[in-house]
Amino acid sequence: MSIQIQGVSKQYGTFQALTDIHLDIPKGELVALLGPSGSGKTTLLRIIAGLEEADEGSISFEGEDLTDIHVKNRQVGFVFQHYALFKHMNVFENVAFGLKVRKKSLRPSAEAIEEKVTELLKLVKMDGFAKRYPAQLSGGQRQRIALARALAVEPKILLLDEPFGALDAKVRKELRRWLRKLHDEFQITSVFVTHDQEEALDVADRIVVMNEGRIEQMGTPEEVYENPASPFVYDFLGNVNLFHGRVHKGKLNVGSVELEAPEHKHISNVDGVAYVRPHHLSISRTKQSVDAIPAKVSYSHAVGPVVYVELKRDGTDEYLEAEISKEQFRQLSIQAGDVVYVQPKEVKVFIPEDFVI
């Protein structure tokens, strides 16, 4: 079932939580609402679910306006960060709950409920746990049960609010891959809220980056990571190095170095900032080109197969971070105090007007 969000705004007192949100989600798509705390992502999710009312705008499922339809009639499955399992019910009873409380005319038989719950527990790899209680389960297991319970009522749309936020890193990584596989099998339209960039990039078909109640950018994980539409998106989706200078006719002048800025070839003499990812900075012992920038190594540390090198730009108080392989690090044979040259391999230059939403 597709979702259409048209001109949705929401205000709490003087706080503007959402401003004129427009978003179309095709049937079967897995969309991540990504942003920092206070960006409006959870408010938008709750409005889609019917748990909150928009001040302006409309919510439609498959073209049908559901703005004034109660949450219980929207056929939505909801999974929260903290599981929200009933402590006094065992796993089977938790998963079966949504089916058992249906009005009599719509309630499946006891046999059908048992068959459905058994099938779902197998699906979420929790068969054999039917008689256990939430307190006897790990965080990852509880979240699987919460998802099974949401799927039991056969929702048309699945909404997940920071579903893995309370779990440790390893379990979180396992569960998000499992969720992706589960989604591909069910093909149910799904929207999940997260502030974890890696999670969104790893799981979603499309990412909606939100900031201060507005949508900054929408696109595939590759699009938003490789082609950020604004400084905020660039900065939010991973570490970045900044080079401040002046933009003039397609060049950013950073001290005595010129960096290419072809997208600004018609701009004359304005402030600009070049954004460069750590893995797009190369390091050499000697100056290899005119756009190489002298810097002093201040610190380095290895994380798995990658070495992070912190450097201080020559003649400034600005620090840079480069990300290189262990093999490159061995070949360079650098240590703290060494003067080297860094060269940006991929650069995105923003001017003041780009910093306005």
Curated annotation (Swiss-Prot):
It catalyses: sulfate(out) + ATP + H2O = sulfate(in) + ADP + phosphate + H(+); thiosulfate(out) + ATP + H2O = thiosulfate(in) + ADP + phosphate + H(+). Its main location: membrane. Pfam families: ABC_tran, CysA_C_terminal, TOBE_3. GO terms for cellular component: ATP-binding cassette (ABC) transporter complex. It is found in: Cell membrane. CDD domains: ABC_CysA_sulfate_importer. Its EC number is 7.3.2.3. Residues 3-237 form the ABC transporter domain. PROSITE patterns: ABC_TRANSPORTER_1 (PS00211), ABC_TRANSPORTER_2 (PS50893), CYSA (PS51237). It is a peripheral membrane protein. SMART domains: AAA. Keywords: ATP-binding, Cell membrane, Membrane, Nucleotide-binding, Sulfate transport, Translocase, Transport. ATP binds at G35, P36, S37, G38, S39, G40, K41, T42. InterPro entries: AAA+_ATPase (IPR003593), ABC_SmlMolc_Importer (IPR050093), ABC_transporter-like_ATP-bd (IPR003439), ABC_transporter-like_CS (IPR017871), CysA_C (IPR041193), Mo/tungstate-bd_C_term_dom (IPR008995), P-loop_NTPase (IPR027417), Sulph_transpt1 (IPR005666). Belongs to the ABC transporter superfamily. Sulfate/tungstate importer (TC 3.A.1.6) family. PANTHER family: SPERMIDINE/PUTRESCINE IMPORT ATP-BINDING PROTEIN POTA (PTHR42781), SPERMIDINE_PUTRESCINE IMPORT ATP-BINDING PROTEIN POTA (PTHR42781:SF4). The complex is composed of two ATP-binding proteins (CysA), two transmembrane proteins (CysT and CysW) and a solute-binding protein (CysP). Part of the ABC transporter complex CysAWTP involved in sulfate/thiosulfate import. Responsible for energy coupling to the transport system. This is Sulfate/thiosulfate import ATP-binding protein CysA. It comes from Bacillus cereus (strain ATCC 10987 / NRS 248). The lineage of its organism: Bacteria, Bacillati, Bacillota, Bacilli, Bacillales.
